[in-house]
């Protein structure tokens, strides 16, 4: 992180530094960040100060999944849509949006679960190459399953469509940062889960607490790995 280390705090997480580094190297001109933690808010401030992103947007992520938060989140997503339409000159394609949903395959075979902080594609491939069993990415980058009914979405007006989208987004397996993350216990109780590789990242405390809880209660083999 040669460039990002010059303008970011030394204790900023590696993911945050990698985002800043990519912007400074000219690899990213359009960026949507989610204010899921203090690090991402600092990344937004730093990237904004550089002036190197043509489109920069901070998406406000709720920490609850009640009805009020769903309505609020739907409005937030619509504002992002409108902001990008104004920037790009393109119009939101409802057909492409609805067609992008696919029915996920249900895994009924024994597998090793990767939990914790998001894993990069390189790290995920390395884990798969070295484990002689199916590997399921259960972090926020791999466990994205939305329960949508496409036929119903075709007839929805924009406001209803985005409310439905916000509903299913917040109805997913919750991130550990959510105020009510108890549903994450389902991940550990799956009878097909035969082991856990738990990924943490330096200077990110959230998932250290969950790891301690899993280590105390889980009955399958558990391996903790930490990256920068």
Please state what every model-predicted region is.
Residues 1-228:
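An N-terminal assembly and electron-transfer interface module characteristic of large anaerobic redox
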